Amino acid sequence: MSQRGNGVMETDARRLEIDRTRMAEDLRGVVAGDVIFDDAGRSLYSTDASLFRLPPLGVVRPRSVEDVAATLEWASRNGVPVHPRGAGTGLAGDALGSGVILDCSRHLRRIIRTADETVCVQPGVTCRQLEAHLAAVGRCFGPDPANAAVTTLGGMIGRNTSGSRFPLYGAVRDRIVSAEVVLSDGTVTELRPTAVTNWGNAEGLTADAARRATLARGIAAVHGAAQDELASWAASGRLVHGGYRLDGVVCPPISDGAATLIDLPRLLAGSSGSLAVVTTVTLKTRPTVAGAAVGLFFFDSLERAAAAALRLQPLVPAACDLFDKRHLALSRSASPTFERLIPALAEAGLLVEFAGDDQAGCQRQLDDAVELMRRSRFHCIDVRRAEVAADVELFWQLSRTVVSTLHGVRGTVRPVQFMEDVVIPPGQLPAFLERYQDVLKRHSATALLYAHAGHGQLHVRPFADPRRSGERERLEALAADLVGEVVRLDGTIGGEQGLGLSRTRFFAEHFPGQVSVCREIKRLFDPAGLLNPGKIVPAAAESRPAWRQLPQTFPESVGLPLLNWTPEALAAEVDACNGCGACRADAGPLRMCPRFRESPGEEWSPRAKANLVAGLLGGEVDPQAAGMEAARAIADTCFNCHQCRVDCAAGVDIPALVTELKAAVVAAEGLRWTPWLLARVDRLSALGGRLRPLSNWALTNPQARWLLERLLGIAQGRRLPRFTGNAFLRWAARRGLTRPSRRAGPRVLFFLDTFARRHDPLVARSLVALLERSGVGVFIDPRQVASGIAAISVGDLDLARRLARRNLRVLTEAVRLGYEIIATEPAAVTAIQHDYPLLLDDEELPRVVAATRHATDYLWELQQEGRLVGGFEPLPQRLLYHQPCHLRQHGGGQRTAGLLRLIPNLSLDTRPTGCSGMAGTFGLDHDHYRTSLRIGRTLLTAVREPELTGGVTECSACRLQMEQATSKQTLHPVVLLAIAAGLAPKDALSGDNLRPATAAGRVATVPAAEG
């Protein structure tokens, strides 16, 4: 019976696979955009920022309104649900479903036109993109979600986003003028305010106008039939939030003989894409606010802070956010700046902003607020003020990083995104807090609370372990109890995060009359119920979506982990990714993710890798060859820059997860020729050194470079460094540096990288000279080999482990003898500190890791101790400093800049230039060459500026990129220091260790950015 059952299950699985294949083929026949129905691709869309995991049938990423219409027409004919999706950063599961995901964030990203008071955009444009665009003309949109860098306008419309500045700007529904939409049957129509006239007469109307008139008539009828329900709601004084909102949609005649006006586009706000799919939207804009002043008020209790928020409302603040003590404590621990800013004894805080066109007026309002707090009995224990733009922005980081700060809580018990977004009348805030504490006590729970206190929007996150048995039931009981208290205080749910999978049932339970009205509106727009079913209006056969938790045991066929960690540790790292989507930022202060910024598709995002590993571990993705081919394509979108690990608030080790993925792909399918070759770039460099001058001639010969590209896959257009052989080690041996030093005092083992050893020995000789002149003994063990970072980056674990073992023997001996380990190559430090512990199980590794640092960090320590060689001569140069990704993850860069500023007359430009795009051997590969240049566009453009005489960076790969499109020299910082100290020849400033890609010396141009 069991075998028969298994056979039936296998047959069903094959049938489903056949059906999916047929569906994908059908859609590819009518859609120009991306159609993704493979297991690996589907797994990326099985989560958002909520607790749920729900694999879709497939994914369509439309390129045009025609693609959207074709998809919905196909879905209507086949009875397949469609779930519109933006960035997938919602906390309620709005973007999840078992049908076809319609991802509008990949291609629909254009700002179409800007008028005096409006702007027309596609739904994939992010809030930050729009605001940056409008700021250039002195305008703004207004609603400001905390994750504005990643939240799309489509998602903001779906959730009716407001943000902290709701009192100043209102919500999205207040800003919509009109929208081009596709209805569930594939019909394209424009929704705009429509007069209800000639209801029964469609003669003379276009099809679009007739459809619009039908919808307007239907809404008017629903509104008329729901008068009792709407009147009852209004009489209660209850705030209107979740669901389809009719307030402000039906506008009565303004004069005798005038028609009732139905504001159809206003209905879209808060609809979670369940009425229509927006393809373009016209939004109102307003002038930017010229002045702002912010106060941070700290209190000795949450209750007093809440009472103070109410007392401040007559002053009409633009924003008033409330933080509890747990959030303040997390913020203090996450940032030294906030540690200084927030008093250790503060139990609660208020961020209060006054904004207007007059800066002096804003400051006077803040003065009034401070005086009010001092005269009142709210026990305000401290106040911080911000009245200049930089300080205002710093204070706002406390509010904007609320969610990301919570993500920094690691461990099984952490604040979970399950009962966010309840809304109460602001005057009820003190009463709610009392009941909130009672609810927590009844359920023996702890929670974190954050609120837009000025307009009554509250976000509650209980501490829980979603993997614990019975935890879901406990949280659901807690949520039900809390929602009950909210309703009793005339509150509601779904303020700015929608109802989604997590709150729709609570909405139906407490507000059945409202749900009946919503059901009629849904039937009018989407008769078949195929658009995002189960959101706002409960589905007929409502299922209970699974939480995104990994099974206790994994299928043996998965074969993971391949790195040196337990299955439990691997699962915990995957589980640490909460799907917040911050790694999808396409601009701003964070550097993650360079690949996503160049190609903004979900598979390029760091969180996609965590989702893919989760799919493998959970059995959703076939680990055999068929599944691994798609997995390879996703894993290859990461080039191991580690910026996600630096910038992720939760500190998820995505590079380690990607190494697991790539290793699994290599185990299943082997390594392709060019990656295999580039993993052994040190051997290639050694061979080139032995064959010089022939090899150096080949670097400049167009025919030879063409042949190299065809045979080896190394990009013909890439400028490559000359080969110098093993000259440095021979020089070091003559100096006695290849034997351990017996001298007293500090001693270092210099860990050589490929570039300094085989291409530019001046870097190595400069470091040795600086160290020796500073009284530091130097040892260069000739047994050391390449760090293995190139092999790690492509998933060649066999080679990486062999190299790591050989190096570990050398490094362990040195550490035992009291040596510290330094390297001039940041990626080599990454390999030792981050990757070797994942490759090898050796008790000596922690000591080796602790003893390893970058050369410039070590030199900075010497400078701080007064032991670094001094007397630097002036160098009249203006150089662009580029901070390498691998140095940034070690906290370096500022120390390098500090060292270089010791050189008189050296002007250093330290502007942020992002990732260079070279990424080790990534930019050498013909397949990635143009992508590499696009990623490095900002850096390449900067270094070309005529006032700059050259560049400086610690990373040899970044150096290659900086010299790719200019004749200017880029040097390692230690070379500049050695020149200024008289320890290296000054002609190195004008030298050129690179050969042009062709004999004609043609300079490569940067290709246009995608999209």
Protein language model regions, located:
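N-terminal glycine-rich flavin-associated loop
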Residues: R15, L27, S50-V82, C104-N147, ...
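N-terminal flexible segment immediately upstream of the FAD-binding catalytic core
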Residues: M1-E73, R77, A87-E117, A146, ...
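Iron-sulfur cluster-binding electron-transfer modules in prokaryotic oxidoreductases
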Residues: D526, P533, W547, P655-G1011
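Long hydrophobic segments that form regular secondary structure
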Residues: C251-L275, F297-L315, L429-V439, G559-V652, ...
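A gly/ser-rich beta-alpha-beta helix-loop segment of oxidoreductase catalytic cores
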Residues: L51, L91-A92, R128, L134-S178, ...
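Ferredoxin-type iron-sulfur electron-transfer modules and their immediate structural context
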Residues: R488-T492, G500-S502, F507-T637, P655-G670, ...
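C-terminal substrate-recognition/cap domain of FAD-linked oxidoreductases
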Residues: F37-Y45, V250-P253, T260-L261, P265-A477, ...
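Terminal amphipathic helices with adjacent charged low-complexity linkers/tails
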Residues: P314-V413, A447, A451, V537, ...
